[in-house]
Amino acid sequence: MDYVVSVHASEELDDDNLTILDLENILLIGEIVERQRDLQTRERKFVVRGATLDGFEAEAIVKFGALGNLFIITVYLV
C-alpha cells in the first residue's frame, strides 16, 4: 500500500502510543464509516474505523492524493 502520513497524523500516533503497524492494521481491516467533503478544498475524505494490533478501536481520516496514493490526515483512538 502506497501512503503518506501527515505530520499531524505522526504526532497523533505518538500521542496515543500507536505505531505505524497499528495504523496499517486500522486501514487494512477497518471499514469506511463516513464520507466527508472538505469545505475549503472540496476534496473527499474518508473516516476509516478499525482496530490497533492490541485490539483498541481507532479511526483514521484519509484522502486520496493527486497521484492516487493514500494520504493519512490524522489517526486517533475512539
Residue positions per predicted region:
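Ribonuclease/tRNase effector modules and their secretory precursors
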Residues: M1-V78
